[in-house]
Amino acid sequence: MEIGKVPENVLKRAVFKQIRHRREEVILHPGVGEDCSAVAVGEDEALVFSTDPITGTDKGIGNLAVHITANDLASSGAEPIGIMTTIILPDGTREIKLRRIMEEIETACSKLKIEVMGGHTEISDAVNRPIINVTGVGKVKKGKLVSTGGLKPGDEIVMTKWAGLEGTSIIAAEKEEKLLETLPRELVDVAKGFKEYLSVIPESKIAMEVGVSAMHDVTEGGVFGALWE
């Protein structure tokens, strides 16, 4: 298989066909484009869970990891509550690197009013750069839970912000020196600053108020990939 998202046909054959639904409390199940699952708690509330790794960059990795997972939760209609983090660092990583990653994570969580609830941290020769996986939890009324599969014929499709926003901010941070050889500093700084627009929580709240039928956080695959999912 090639680098990137596992193809849909492989997901269906190798992943989804192996999974069986056996708990009635689980009310949102695995599927193509479904980034969350949900568990019913009580009569009218559900806890929503999502998990995502950051593997493509180590610049601002803590900030990215928090926002990507929180966005998945928000796209299901949930209010993000907290996260658990798994941080795997390559052999020889200095303590200051770990501290900076955690500072990024805590800063992002503070802005979103969510909490770091725990996690796991280790040094491993299995990786050659930092890898973070974040599992997030949020809450939503069961009747307000939004699935990617809720899209209906005739629905209007609305995209917020800009295509390529996250990728542009990553490239600008990763390749800053190279870009400055041909582009003005002001332009590169604007591109790096796109990281401040990563959260979709404000938009999801507005969408919920007007009765949205489906939401999806666009990541790998771009706009067309997200619509296909």
Predicted regions and their residues:
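Helix-biased detector of long, well-ordered alpha-helical tracts
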Residues: 1-229
